[in-house]
Amino acid sequence: MATILVLHGPNLNLLGLREPGIYGATTLADINQTLSEMATKAGHHLQYLQSNAEYELIDRIHDARKEGVDFIIINPAAFTHTSVALRDALLGVDIPFIEVHLSNVHKREAFRHHSFFSDVAQGVICGFGATSYELALQAAFKILGTPV
């Protein structure tokens, strides 16, 4: 059984309420529930953290190494375009990760096109709404050698 950490960045606590035309009507609790069901079926354990504070996400990444977390799925949200510190934390713990986004960041404002994570991630999944997380989890299962 692998442990997979799912990190949700700033403002994702407002999913379902904030700009539903861009981010959809699905709540963060709904996303986490779906992922938990998928992980249970595959025999894995998921941990979650949503934070609007960069340092909390960094601390959780550091703790993941100590805890033996096997994989990270991260939606850095607005930190995608600004956080060298989060990038360095992920590189520092040497845990494979997938970057995920609900919206297609490449169809949005130009400042959203740059990511500090995509060049060091196992992969990037964006533009499929809440399904982006499910696709990321399926990819994590494959990378970990688990049947999907």
From Swiss-Prot:
Listed GO MF terms: 3-dehydroquinate dehydratase activity
Pathway: Metabolic intermediate biosynthesis; chorismate biosynthesis; chorismate from D-erythrose 4-phosphate and phosphoenolpyruvate: step 3/7
Site-annotated residues for Transition state stabilizer: 18
Keyword tRNA-binding attached: no
Annotated Pfam families: DHquinase_II (PF01220)
Active site residues of this protein: 23 (proton acceptor), 101 (proton donor)
Protein's GO biological process: amino acid biosynthetic process; aromatic amino acid family biosynthetic process; chorismate biosynthetic process; quinate catabolic process
Binding-site list for substrate: 75, 81, 88, 102-103, 112
Entry keyword set: Amino-acid biosynthesis, Aromatic amino acid biosynthesis, Lyase
Disulphide linkage map: none
Entry EC number(s): 4.2.1.10
Record's catalysed reaction(s): 3-dehydroquinate = 3-dehydroshikimate + H2O
Self-association and partners: Homododecamer.
Family membership noted in the UniProt record: Belongs to the type-II 3-dehydroquinase family.
Role description: Catalyzes a trans-dehydration via an enolate intermediate.
Protein name: 3-dehydroquinate dehydratase
